[in-house]
């Protein structure tokens, strides 16, 4: 009861207070709530600017004239659910703006009236009045819209005092009803009549009069366990004249099946177009012949029977089913009734809307021919249906536009044929057991399709093109990729929330250009390059992605887990293979051009060759063993050169070699011979006593005949040890073809042996000398202490003017 009262109070405040509040849009509203505080009197010191005061659910038993005197701005006063026994309306004489007064659910027995011209809502229901608390002052409240009354006796004379008022709602909240004068209710002038009945009330008379009273009639708490219609069992149900009600609502009804049958028969011949019964329980023995129901002469369009509970009764269910389906009206709802089956007459009916939700209907309901040519909406939600193709064959004989088959056990096999009407545009197939094969059993002209919470893994490519589809809901399935729109070219809304989508497909971006709304949140996204276009879509398409960006979070890779997609940065170059290749090619071309420029401008190849030679020499020196040093040598190096290059040898080569510590022993050509020895013997002796031999190569060296013998001697003398003991210095370029064929040794050396090239650029000389010193880096076994440099020169005129100079340091 408290729940009903709360709804009623809320609705009344919305209609009464807000309609008056618009007159003072600039004034500040203040609500003070003292409800459920066990107060025994109205609190003192209330703020004068209070506009709404709630004192409900307390222990107030008396109101003083001074309680609300200071609240000149008060508009809403709620005093329901207290213990007030007497009410003097004059208590509110200083509350000129009061428009809403609720004193329901108290213990009121009397009211002292005072004119409150501004009152719009007055509720005195559920009190202990002996008669209805209505006076002449009540009739003077010209702005009154909602009036709540209660009383043990209801008489015509009471309502006549307010018959001239045009009321919106009248509430009769009755605790007891000992007397009702028939014909009293029709005196009221109200749009809506709301009656809450006490136990053991003559419901029949109130229903009879209520239908004549208001456009909307709602009756609550109908308890007819013992039928009150027994006096009519052998009589014809009277036809009501002057009926006004077009909407009849019965709530919390407990009655026998015969009572329900008679209520329907009574209402059937009235002005009622919409008849709703909620929370109904019926059963018991059946006495009336239900085949005698008179279906003629009615304006009924809609019947709703919701939340039905059965007591044990002895009646064939077929009679119940046919009682409703033979009514042949536009709209019929029987929901939450635990109904296992439904029968239809053999002839065509004019039903346009059928709602059998929340029952236990099975496929058997479609196994008999059903003729519903005008049916446009069918709701079979939350039943036990299993075969989609069976439903399709039933629907093919209708004009169905909207079909709800959600929360069933439906499946579809590929070998089952489906036949849908061309008119079907909306289908709800959610919460079933459909797999991918369901796409082979869809109506061609479907526009809105809901397949959420099924077992769909992919959208098959070999399906019928649904060219009219506008909205597709695939949420809570098992998709691993965003589906493409190749078969849904006009798709505008796509929902794939809560699937197993890791990345977006290329087909989606190529074929879903028309999609305006996409919900793909709460999927385990793999934030790699495959998802880059999808991330860009979310960032730059305003309002398209539902739930962006809180519902779009990376699941893989692990280093990005928990990161929102909007915070993931995937560079274009790392995801675009073509761009990456072009970039690499461009970079390589730039580097190649830079290297070429350096080679031309800085002679880089020469530096590289010299660096390579120095490295090779350094490695060879490190590999040199003490066994290789046991050779009996007195000089570090023997220098062979032509007379033409002597200036370079004396002023460049020798000073650079001696520059380090002066301990280098050099044997070189100078022009004097050693007495007693031939030039050949002296040359061989110098080569044998020198650890390494340097040959300064130039065109003049090649033209000197003696210079070819010196490489020959050195080559053959050191060949058994290593070519590493021969050092070639190319002072000037010498093409190999310029070397005469009669001197193969020099050509062989130049082909096999890497040589040091003297740079023309003086800035490169440092690297040249470093390479040369590295090549000469070895300690003589018998060199100790301080040595004195001696020079030996030999001249041999018979060999073209070449010279051998021995520069030696003797040990002290």
Swiss-Prot record:
Residues 633-776 form the TIR domain. Residues 599-812 are cytoplasmic. GO terms for molecular function: identical protein binding; lipopeptide binding; NAD+ nucleosidase activity, cyclic ADP-ribose generating; signaling receptor activity; Toll-like receptor 2 binding; transmembrane signaling receptor activity. One of its GO terms (cellular component) is plasma membrane. Keywords: Glycoprotein, Immunity, Inflammatory response, Innate immunity, Leucine-rich repeat, Membrane, NAD, Receptor, Repeat, Signal, Transmembrane, Transmembrane helix. LRR repeats lie at residues 24-46, 49-70, 73-94, 97-118, 119-139, 143-166, 296-321, 325-348, 350-373, 374-395, 399-420, 423-443, 445-467, 468-489, 490-510. Residues 523-577 form the LRRCT domain. Binds MYD88 via their respective TIR domains. SUPFAM superfamilies: L domain-like, Toll/Interleukin receptor TIR domain. It comes from the Eukaryota. Its main location: membrane. This is Toll-like receptor 10. Residues 1-19 form the signal peptide. The keyword Metal-binding does not apply. Belongs to the Toll-like receptor family. Residues 20-577 are extracellular. Pfam families: LRR_4, LRR_8, TIR. The lineage of its organism: Eukaryota, Metazoa, Chordata, Craniata, Vertebrata. GO terms for biological process: cellular response to bacterial lipopeptide; inflammatory response; innate immune response; toll-like receptor signaling pathway. It is a single-pass type I membrane protein.
